[in-house]
Amino acid sequence: MQRVNVGHKALADYNSLIGRALAEEIRALAEPLKGRRMLHLSATAFGGGVAEIQYTLIPLMIDAGIDAEWRVIQGQEEFYDVTKTIHNALQGDERGLTDGQRAIFDGYNKLNADSLADADEWDVIVVHDPQPAAIPEFVQTTRPRWVWRCHIDLSTPNPDVLDFLAPRLRAYDACIFHMPTYVPHGAGLNEAVIWPPAIDPLAPKNMALAPDDAAYIVDQFGVDVSRPLMLQVSRFDPWKDPLGVIDAYREVKRVHPGMQLALVGSMAHDDPEGWEYWNRTQDYCNEDPDIFMFSNLNNVGAVEVNAFQVQAAVCIQKSIREGFGLTVSEALWKSRPTIGGRVGGIVAQISDGETGYLVNSPEECAKRTLDILADPGATRDMTRRAKEHVRRKFLMPRLLRDWLALMHRMAGETTVELEVVAGD
């Protein structure tokens, strides 16, 4: 395994954004935990929301007095091919696992478990998502409490793949899910804890950026900043439905011929299908000069994503399945009018008609885009409400508070406030 260097962050820098009550609660929770040790394990250090969260969460935990560390597991392409199949199946894909794929999954998990020689030196070990989920089965130690943090939608999983994973999940003292509907019934979990993820308002991706600066950055990529822009920021993945976004854009363009579309994504090494779907999306664009596709490999990093979101007339997350979709909160925090698919965690972030719009089809997405463009006054009111909603519920200090509360619970202190669902 490889340790990830996360740098330094200070909780005090967030106080003006979160208010006194939450800041004081965090301090009170952190004080008796000083010196406790928490290790996080995940599949990748870049590309995707899990890694983004870790780059802020881990240094904030350290600032709060926790001895926290983040490591990335090792794996080859055959392993990530299998874990992508598992990921898709847990979100409803009908394809199951062969005996060979099951052996590959367990084999790489054992390989990583064997490299975890210091497991008994940690108070809590957190495993993120399915890729490393079997590691506790292969670690011979009784000291750490094991926690599985699930970042995907498990509301309608492939039953065969869930049956394969469930015995491995029963090795955990607690499993954390974004929403109650994601807790898999019949899996026999010891305990399920519910909390949503969060964004870092001070990270380069979300820091305040003047409109002129955003326009300058976007202009460098060949986008005409004098014309309106529809934007989706997401991985290139069928669950994110970039083809549906293109369909919506084409409908809008019939009314607003100057409309442009940018699809911006990050290509992660644990997502072998990403390039295949990139190519499929590119073909679907049909060489339209007003459709742009960018990734981290086009030098689109955190600041550039920020600029595209600030510049966009409408931000879209038209997922058809979605673990949570933090790009929604990112756009809402920037006071951008936002449209999301009526699925998963997007519904927790958008109150339809109040803080944004929820849609079920490309046609609805196009209609709501036209509504936004037609009524700037109502749109401004909606975006103000949306920013305040994100401030209350989806900023990183609230997530830190939840992790500190869980550490108390793992130490046997059950009086801390957490949403807990009994395992079944």
Residues covered by each model-derived region:
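Conserved donor-binding/catalytic core segment of Leloir-type glycosyltransferases
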Residues: 39, 218-240, 261-262
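Short acidic/histidine- and often glycine-rich active-site loop of Leloir-type glycosyltransferases
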Residues: 186, 343-353, 357-359
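Nucleotide-activated donor-binding/catalytic signature segment of Leloir-type glycosyltransferases, i.e.
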Residues: 265-307
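Aromatic "clamp/platform" in nucleotide-sugar-dependent glycosyltransferases that forms part
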Residues: 320
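Short glycine/serine-rich donor-binding loops of glycosyltransferases
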Residues: 325-328, 346
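Short hydrophobic beta-strand element within catalytic cores of glycosyltransferases
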Residues: 328, 337-340, 350
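Conserved acidic donor-binding segment of nucleotide-sugar-dependent glycosyltransferases
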Residues: 352-363, 371-376
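A short, well-ordered alpha-helix in the C-terminal region of glycosyltransferases
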Residues: 378-393, 399, 405
